[in-house]
Amino acid sequence: MGMGTFTTDESDKHEESYLSLGLTVSQSKKNNTEYPKVLLLLAAYLDRSVQKNEDLLDSNKIKDSSTIFHGHRAPDLSIKLYAERIFKYSECSPSCFVLALIYMERYLQQPHVYMTSLSVHRLLITSVVVAAKFTDDAFFNNAFYARVGGISTVEMNRLELDLLFNLDFRLKVDLETFGSYCLQLEKETMVLVIDRPIQQVHGVNSTKDLSRNSSIDESCKSELMRYSSQALQGCS
């Protein structure tokens, strides 16, 4: 069952969560500049997880194993802005970000593997790409996703394969699990009210500086227009 766009169903006990997170907005009707709430809450959740893990690493309470997702330094772009960038250019359904969180947490079940500022951005873009390919009706190629994420196509391919093999290609998520993650993200609303504002993650990786690289944005926009033109020609 695809989860790209959810429809109203009074029998679905998670319907309110879907509405709250902005998962019911059809991608074809997404014509405003607002981002679905799921992006903000996911970013807050990932920010807190990263901070917690790095505090434990600094105190030598845990030991992190380097993975293919680890960069040499952290990107200047915050997780929130990175998630918004992915959503803006990939045109994936909002539900892909919930699936991405599920895939990320499954990946992190490996011993001594923790999400930090050196790995969170790559984990996020890769998980969203895998989710979009699995659940959405249309998606781009990895060369395009690589430009969106600020990495090379070769690296995008390798990251995707690594994630898939570590997940044992088990991408299907039942509605109960999906709904529970939606509820988990909803709880971040209270955390944002009580806790500090989302902090920018400074410092990581060899991902390109997307915050100041307008040429990458123009490339993505140009590619989007080309894909849209081809799609229209195919329908004529």
Curated annotation (Swiss-Prot):
Keywords: Cell cycle, Cell division, Cyclin. The keyword Ion transport does not apply. GO terms for molecular function: protein kinase binding. It comes from the Eukaryota. Signal peptide: none annotated. The keyword Cell division applies. One of its GO terms (biological process) is cell division. InterPro entries: Cyclin-like_sf, Cyclin_P/U, Cyclin_PHO80-like. PANTHER family: PROTEIN CNPPD1, PTHR15615. Belongs to the cyclin family. Cyclin U/P subfamily. This is Cyclin-P3-1.
